Amino acid sequence: MNETREEQLLSAGRTVEAEKKTDVEALKKKYAASEEKVYTVVTTVQVDDETENEFTFLFKKPKAASYDRYVKTMSNSVTKASKSFTFDNIIDEQRDMLRDTVEEYPAITISIADKLLRMLGLADTTSVKKL
């Protein structure tokens, strides 16, 4: 009986994941047709040694005002700055999904903010050479 219940739970989980992927694909199509620059950000959270959760979000390209708020807030709290910056730029349809994800994995906003900053030109490597 436990195996049957476990199979039902796994099946329900797969159904939910399939629905999420369908929703993301529909949103991608919607925003691909618009003038707005929207990017897909996929992040994987390692829950434990055997489990990983993958999340896919769509973000608008950050505007200068959003970046300025991020830099201003960073001096007080990197966590708050990353969270605000991430929520500033998520598409409206995924705001609740992001909120739920952040409740469970609060550090995810730091990873996402890093990717958003790279859209604005943050580089891993910058070199200087004396002439």
PLM feature spans:
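Short, charged/polar N-terminal "headpieces" of proteins
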Residues: 1-61, 130-131
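Short, surface-exposed, charged amphipathic helix/loop patches that serve as local interaction elements
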Residues: 51-131
